[in-house]
Amino acid sequence: MDRTIVTNATCMSCGCLCDDIDLHTEDGRIVRAERACRLGREWFFGYHGDSQTTALVDGRPASMDEAVEAAASILARADLPLIYGLGNSTCESQRAAIMLAEDIGGVIDTHTSMTHGPSKLGAQLVGKVTCTLGEVRNRADLLIYWGTNPVETHPRHFTRYAYTPRGKFVPGGRYDRTMILVDVQDTLSARAADQFLQIQPGTDFELLTVLRAIVRDQKVDADLLAATGLTLEHATDLVAQMTGARFGVFFFGTGLSRTRGRHMNVAALHSLTMALNAFTKFAAVPMRDLGNDVGADNVMSWLTGYPVGVDFSRGYPRSNPGEFTAVDLLTRREADAALIVAADPWSTMPEAAVEHLETIPHVVIDRAGAGPRANARVQFVTASPGIDAPGTAYRMDWVPVSMRAAFNSRQATDEEVLGRIRHALAAA
């Protein structure tokens, strides 16, 4: 048996983008992923490098050339084609997808619109103060998780970046840090926290507004605070901990950005963060879900000027969340073809959107091991980023990570497939 160890592989199972994973391989298969969490093991053990299938057309195996021609034909005939996904693809592939969207005069949207799209809008409203996870590890002595459950969604966030590691200015690790969780329900993360503040659903904006008023020594609306489920004592104690910290960080999730208030919640959090900087160093970092959601935001912004929901139907980019975002286009039944890249809208989108997606011709580009899509007209089986496909991805703190391939790939990369579709359209 041919056994090898590939060191420092990158895991794209979540926004932590851990790049310290040692892969133990046997005859080209991953048998152990050292230091990987539960989600990471699922990512690596889901790798099927021995897959002989490169493409499917109408559910049957097909050559790459046949599949490319079929995909190009579907997109060329569409009046308003939609390209969606990209959260588990490389920045290079995301760039190719945007160029394809421009070529076909379609709409391109990413997984961000369903998770932290409101976070982008909130930051645009008031600005933001942020930091890297390296700064958190070495400096932060107060961690406030808001509307997120990292124990289950980002299992190594505590141990690798935030709560337990020993840092330059926090040599005692967790003994030099305080971790507070603000959420609407008891979770595994709440049980790990030093302090858990359970608030009423849909009252994040009110609580953030009250906290900022206390920070700025302004009058507090007692009725507003009572609606949150916390007392004035709770709020003043929390503010005292925030202003007394040497370096504090908010980590916020979709429990803040996707609940009542949406982007205004995030704007309120960033406003509170900026107010706290009059007393101490404070920052805010979103807990991003997929491995390269942040990369998709960045590449979309670089090339189009907008992070989500970009429409090229008029020959130039324009964006309007709620109009050109994928869920809305599909729910209104406006898109008449779709290209899904490294995403699973069937398990994440509302039923109405999925129902329409199933009625229109759609092409799927996803890594080996994702499984066949029964109703996909064309499906490409591609290499897995960070496993057998090199490229660049962005961590949740906007730090780029260069990924090398641990194996020689038998499949094409997402970027190569998208490039071939563009070439076929240009030659038609």
State where each predicted segment sits.
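N-terminal export/assembly segments and adjacent metallocofactor-ligating motifs
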Residues: 1-204, 209-213, 334, 421-428
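N-terminal, charge-rich interaction modules
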Residues: 7-20, 258, 287-301
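Secondary-structure boundary/capping signal
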Residues: 79-82, 108, 280, 284, ...
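Active-site diphosphate/adenylate-binding microenvironment
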Residues: 83, 272, 288
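Non-catalytic alpha/beta scaffold blocks inside enzyme catalytic domains
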Residues: 120-279, 305-428
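Short, flexible loop segments at boundaries between secondary-structure elements
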Residues: 277, 284-293, 367-369
